[in-house]
Amino acid sequence: MSTHVVIYTMQSCPHCVDFKKMLQTEGIDFVDRDIEKNEEEYQIFVEVTQNDYVPAVLIIEEGVEKHKSFLYAPDRDYNELTEAVAIIKKHLA
């Protein structure tokens, strides 16, 4: 099974900048989707999350027979960036 981490961010968001630094410090590989730069990506993000809070985390677990996705959003699934990092680490373990 392989696990992929996608984070949804905005360049103007200071929490997003801090979050990316935390993930890099922890050695966590991730794909950064800047929804501020891509209107289509932004619309999909809002539709899926039902809000526009960032940074949000999408975890994709790909297995031989099944594929699972988990979406975590601020103020819904975590309040602190350290909690988001812990959630990601749990999926990567």
Q: Language model features by range: what are they?
A:
Residues 20-23, 47, 72:
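Short, glycine/charged-enriched secondary-structure capping and boundary segments
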Residues 1-28:
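Local sequence-structure signature of Cys/Sec-based thiol-disulfide redox active-site neighborhoods
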Residues 59-93:
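Non-catalytic, surface beta->alpha helical segment in thiol-disulfide oxidoreductase systems
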Residues 12, 35-38, 74:
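Short beta->alpha junction loops/turns
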Residues 35-53, 81-92:
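Thioredoxin-like thiol-disulfide oxidoreductase module
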